[in-house]
Amino acid sequence: MAGGSGERFWPLSRVATPKHLVPLLGARTMLEETVRRVEHALPAEQIFVLTNAAQIDACRAAVPHLPPAQFIAEPAKRDTAPACALGTALVRRLDPDAVVVFLPADALIKDAATFAGQLQKASALAAKDDVIVTFGIRPDHPSTRFGYLEAGAALPESTAGCPFFHAERFVEKPDAARAAGYLASGRFFWNAGIFLWRTGTFLREAQKHQPDLAAFIEAFPKGDASAYIAKEFPTLPKISVDYAIMEKAARVAVVEARFDWDDVGSWTALPAHLPLDAGGNTIQGTVTVHGSENNIVIARGRVIALCGVRDLIVVETEDAILVCHRDSAEHVKQLQPHLPDKVR
């Protein structure tokens, strides 16, 4: 799924080239890194990119080895449940018994081999039973940025290298006190937003809980579906797959991820993955610092010089500059309504 806006990464992230289409952490975009990672488990012809009309050309350019037909543009922004319904419908017409894997294009996972191995085991579980499978990340701190899921009893399919549990419940992003309690309990995982199901399993759950999504899947044409998608997709309810399906589904299993994971949610995520100088500054581009500490500085064209400052985020592009305190990184998206259209 590659249709997000990435507004917290402005000014590098824009409407047509958001976070997953920007080389934030290296030479490749996050979308290309995601596709390369999935190719450890699946052949390229089975990988589809769900995006939108504003981003589809840039997505195709980022992953040129995938055929253009494997990039699907959603005609309207309807959140993740309709996106999952669209992806399920596309795969269902190719193979009614197939297992579909949905994953975000903008998460960072470096251990591709472990990821691929667990993905294959999760796919086998989803194929065998009418169960939806999701990945959970064991938290190492009480984050309030993620949704959580509570794990119950271990499943018979569980192994030391790939633990499976019954998913008891999904919970929204908690406050600090609840997050601390979740961490202390040892029963809660961060929701990684990675889901697997057989097409028939998703359809049955949609029939019970989201009949509009079920009807969309059932009426999906076998031939050219572009006109159908353009007409029907914008009418679907705007709702996340967590609320629409995952919280209500009869059987959900959670896999404890044994690979590294970071959703790279804002500028403050970069220091964990990029080199730091002696002052703890994270620097990309031509940057000079003097008496400055703990800054994140990205220069994409001009020279940036910092003197006697700390805890700043400074990002320079050809047509815009961001300066903010590190503590305000989560609020960068709130600039969007106030920015000129030409730099959004």
Provide a role label for each language-model segment.
Residues 112-235, 253, 326:
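Conserved core of the sugar-phosphate nucleotidyltransferase
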Residues 48, 100, 168, 187, ...:
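A residue-level structural signature of the nucleotidyltransferase/glycosyltransferase Rossmann-like core
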Residues 8-11, 15-18, 23-120, 137, ...:
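Conserved N-terminal catalytic core of the sugar/cofactor nucleotidyltransferase
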Residues 197-344:
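Left-handed beta-helix
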Residues 21, 71, 132-134, 251-254:
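Conserved beta-strand scaffold positions in the cores of enzyme catalytic domains, especially
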Residues 77-82, 141-143, 176-178, 261-263:
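A short acidic, often aromatic-flanked loop/helix-cap motif at beta-alpha or helix-coil junctions
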Residues 1-2, 50, 101-104, 134-138, ...:
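Short beta-strand segments
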